[in-house]
């Protein structure tokens, strides 16, 4: 029987933790077995895979565990993989269908969320409730050589006991490693690329008050290249479906964390897998596989990943199942807004050791001190290492390490994601970034985001626009003034949905009241325009129905155009069964007439004349209609200015013409040809120039003073003015006294 890998991310309120009579391993103190019908689920998956209708695309899974009934409704999720997703297995590119990845919720329970994959039949997963997270995994992962009456196990996060006693920096490398990495990052031999996107953050949107990146507002997705070594492949049953399910669950976990974080106005940061390379067991003997050796230290393992060129990706990670020294679960290069290389969007560069490397990399392992860590610890480790890539060092200080506080109120909330040691994941702060991390990450995003991030193509909850898949969108909690809609800070399957009992939301359209009900029919919702009458609500929709159009050929746009099917798109000439034409330049037409609206009889260009001319006086009563400023004129050779004069367009301005005149290659070719033909003239000019310079030096040298006492004094130039001394007098005191006053600046009494 094939396997079903089901990765859940559920939100539900349950209280089944705390019973430790059935331990699973040294980390998991209690579990329950699941044994639902795998054949039935596999058939449902195959039917949903081929489904065309909306209803048939859902997969239903019902099972009972921990004292309650679970009714899952899941739909294919393509948001985690880019449209050009590429999969390599064993060195070969294979066509792969990602339709086995699902996202859904518990039927009838708002705010719940499931994310997973369905492949052939059995379940593995993660349950992430509102109050108590739970996880589902295949039983063979824990009972390899034992026959058990169930195919999956389910356990609560309250039943997970992850120790923190392994080393001062358990989970992340110690400070000496980061110091060496920082020094290496500073040794780049190439000038780091400079990114200045300050202007992208200045505009503010009209819908909700928040920062917007005007030029590239939707470039919010970091594309990933993820490799797995042969040990990771062995760990997950030697099937590519199981490996991709693991990658999917990790990416979904960090995607949820980063999307819900406001990085100083930069929001909805998401992740998408662009490429996966799976090293299978046969790659263990492949000499081209850099990860083939079993005993590789964590720093060397990261270096092997960095030695590949990852310019096509925002980040590149390697997943492994290795037990690194000192309990290290992950390692990554720390990004910075400027001054050093490394982190998101970093390009392949040359460093002091003579090697070109890509420092937009990191590594993750799922093994720690001989045991495999729970999924939630691995997910937070991934978010932690990616946080390094995004520019955040480890948290420090009282403000950002509340778990070290003496106050029990702060301490019980736990530390944040970027805490130096691994967190258990069950505390309030364990899945959040501290204010210190937010400040650091926002600076890096501001500098680098637009250099490699891409548009996600997915609806963005929180941008104030109701997009496909959203019921409403009132923005984030600090912006939402809507009592009808859940804001974007709510749980995944709750945000951007209508609150219970609410009929509509003002974010859906102008025909919804602030009381969350539809406006009465005939209430105005759109002002009238030149080509459309006033819009009125219909009483059963939040959106304003299309306005009734005015009659065709109604004048609009200051009587320069006419209405066609409710749009101001026709020429005023059409009102009189004429065609619009362009007034050409003739001796009789000045630059003002070239900016008139001109008409002609159909198929008769020679009849083209201004609306103010005698030819069309019968239609326009002698009134001259002018083009809008900026309109093309004189057969597209110019444009109309605000004074209704046709300004010819000179593609080559004076500076451009001067540049072309000086640097014209033909000019230098002509000069070269002339020199070849008249070489004797060039020779004579050279001799004359040398003689002129020699004569100048000879003549001027006799008049130039010299410090050499053996040379004669310089001769004065003819006509040089000589300084005359004043006549000597016998009144010496009277001559010196004014001089003293001038030099000292004193006044004498």
From Swiss-Prot:
Residue intervals passing through the bilayer: 674-694
Membrane topology according to the record: Single-pass type I membrane protein
Binding positions (Zn(2+)): 172, 384, 388, 394
Positions of the Disintegrin domain: 458-552
Modified residues (Phosphothreonine): 720
Primary localization: membrane
SUPFAM superfamilies: Blood coagulation inhibitor (disintegrin), Metalloproteases ('zincins'), catalytic domain
Active site: 385
Keyword Cell wall biogenesis/degradation assigned: no
Catalyzed reactions per annotation: Endopeptidase of broad specificity
A GO cellular component entry from the record: Golgi apparatus
Enzyme class: hydrolase
Annotated site (Cleavage): 213-214
Cross-referenced PROSITE patterns: ADAM_MEPRO, DISINTEGRIN_2, ZINC_PROTEASE
Cofactor or coenzyme needed: Zn(2+)
Disulfide cross-links: 222-314, 345-452, 400-436, 461-496, 472-485, 474-480, 484-516, 504-512, 511-537, 525-544, 531-563, 556-568, 573-599, 581-608, 583-598, 595-640, 633-646
Alphabetically ordered keywords of this record: Cleavage on pair of basic residues, Disulfide bond, Glycoprotein, Hydrolase, Membrane, Metal-binding, Metalloprotease, Notch signaling pathway, Phosphoprotein, Protease, SH3-binding, Signal, Transmembrane, Transmembrane helix, Zinc, Zymogen
Motif SH3-binding location, chain numbering: 709-716, 723-729
Pfam families associated with the record: ADAM10_Cys-rich, Disintegrin, Pep_M12B_propep, Reprolysin_2
EC number: 3.4.24.81
Subcellular location: Membrane
Residues modified by glycosylation: 268, 279, 440, 552
Comment, domains: The conserved cysteine present in the cysteine-switch motif binds the catalytic zinc ion, thus inhibiting the enzyme. The dissociation of the cysteine from the zinc ion upon the activation-peptide release activates the enzyme. The propeptide keeps the metalloprotease in a latent form via a cysteine switch mechanism. This mechanism may be mediated by a highly conserved cysteine (Cys-172) in the propeptide, which interacts and neutralizes the zinc-coordinating HEXGHXXGXXHD catalytic core of the metalloprotease domain. The dissociation of the cysteine from the zinc ion upon the activation-peptide release activates the enzyme.
Name of this protein: Disintegrin and metalloproteinase domain-containing protein 10
Organism expressing this protein natively: Xenopus laevis
Recorded name of the encoding gene: adam10
């Amino acid at each position: 029987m094939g396997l079903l890998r089901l990765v859940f991310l559920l939100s539900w309120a349950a209280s089944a933790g705390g019973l430790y009579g059935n331990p699973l391993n040294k980390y998991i103190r209690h579990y329950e077995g699941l044994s639902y019908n795998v054949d039935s689920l596999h058939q449902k998956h195959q039917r949903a895979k081929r489904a065309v209708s909306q209803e048939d695309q859902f997969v239903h899974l019902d099972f009972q565990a921990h004292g309650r009934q679970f009714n899952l409704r899941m739909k294919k999720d393509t948001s985690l993989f880019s449209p050009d997703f590429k999969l390599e297995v064993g060195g070969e590119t294979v066509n792969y269908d990602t339709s086995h990845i699902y996202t859904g919720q518990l039927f009838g329970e708002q705010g719940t969320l499931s994310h997973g994959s369905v492949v052939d039949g059995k379940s593995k997963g993660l349950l992430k409730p509102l109050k108590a997270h739970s996880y589902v995994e295949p039983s063979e992962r824990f009972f390899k050589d034992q026959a058990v009456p169930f195919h999956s196990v389910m356990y609560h996060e309250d039943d997970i006991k992850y120790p923190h006693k392994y080393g001062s920096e358990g989970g992340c490398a110690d400070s000496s490693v980061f110091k060496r990495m920082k020094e290496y990052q500073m040794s780049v031999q190439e000038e780091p690329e400079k990114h200045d996107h300050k202007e992208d953050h200045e505009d503010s949107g009209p819908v909700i008050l928040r920062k917007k990146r005007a030029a590239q507002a939707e470039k919010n997705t970091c594309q990933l290249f993820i490799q797995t070594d042969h040990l990771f492949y062995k760990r997950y049953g030697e099937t590519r479906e199981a490996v991709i399910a693991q990658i999917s669950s990790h990416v979904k976990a960090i995607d949820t964390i980063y999307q819900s974080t406001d990085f100083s106005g930069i929001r909805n940061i998401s992740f998408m897998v662009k490429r996966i390379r799976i090293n299978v067991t046969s790659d263990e003997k492949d000499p081209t596989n850099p990860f083939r050796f079993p005993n590789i230290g964590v720093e060397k393992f990261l270096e092997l990943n960095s030695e590949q060129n990852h310019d096509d990706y925002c980040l590149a990670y390697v997943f492994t199942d290795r037990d690194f020294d000192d309990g290290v679960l992950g390692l990554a290069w720390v990004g910075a807004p400027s001054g050093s290389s490394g982190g998101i969007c970093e390009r392949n560069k040359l460093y002091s050791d003579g090697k070109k490397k890509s420092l937009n990399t990191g590594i993750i392992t799922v093994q720690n001190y001989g045991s495999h860590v729970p999924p939630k610890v691995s997910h937070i480790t991934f978010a932690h290492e990616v946080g390094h890539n995004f520019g955040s060092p480890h948290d420090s200080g009282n403000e950002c390490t509340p778990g070290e506080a003496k106050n029990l109120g702060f301490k019980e909330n736990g530390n944040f994601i970027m805490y130096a040691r691994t967190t258990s994941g069950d505390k309030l702060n364990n899945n959040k970034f501290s204010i210190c991390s937010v400040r650091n990450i926002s600076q890096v995003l501001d500098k680098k985001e637009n250099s490699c991030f891409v548009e996600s193509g997915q609806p963005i909850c929180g941008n104030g626009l109701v997009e496909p898949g959203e019921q409403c969108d009132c923005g984030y909690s600090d912006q939402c003034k809507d009592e009808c809609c859940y804001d974007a800070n709510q749980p995944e399957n709750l945000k951007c949905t209508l609150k219970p009992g609410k009929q509509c939301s003002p974010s859906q359209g102008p025909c919804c009241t602030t009381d969350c009900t539809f406006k009465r029919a005939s209430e105005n919702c759109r002002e009238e325009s030149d080509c459309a009458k006033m819009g009125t609500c219909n009483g059963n929709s939040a959106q304003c129905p299309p306005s009734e159009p005015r009659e065709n050929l109604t004048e609009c746009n200051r009587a320069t155009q006419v209405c066609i099917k409710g749009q101001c798109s026709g020429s005023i000439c059409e009102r009189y069964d004429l065609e619009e034409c362009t007034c050409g330049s003739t001796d009789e037409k000045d630059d003002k007439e070239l900016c008139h609206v001109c008409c002609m009889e159909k198929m008769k260009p020679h009849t083209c004349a201004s609306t103010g001319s005698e030819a069309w006086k019968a239609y326009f009563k002698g009134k001259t209609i002018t083009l809008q400023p900026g309109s093309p004129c004189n057969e597209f050779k110019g444009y109309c200015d605000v004074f209704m004069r046709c300004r010819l367009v000179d593609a080559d301005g004076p500076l451009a013409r001067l540049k072309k005149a000086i640097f014209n290659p033909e000019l230098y070719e002509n000069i070269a040809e002339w020199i070849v033909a008249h070489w004797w003239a060039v020779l004579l000019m050279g001799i004359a120039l040398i003689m002129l310079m020699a004569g100048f030096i000879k003549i001027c040298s006799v008049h130039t003073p010299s410090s050499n006492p053996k040379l004669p004094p310089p001769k004065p130039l003819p006509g040089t003015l000589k300084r005359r001394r004043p006549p000597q007098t016998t009144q010496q005191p009277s001559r010196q006294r004014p001089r003293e006053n001038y030099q000292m600046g004193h006044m004498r009494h």
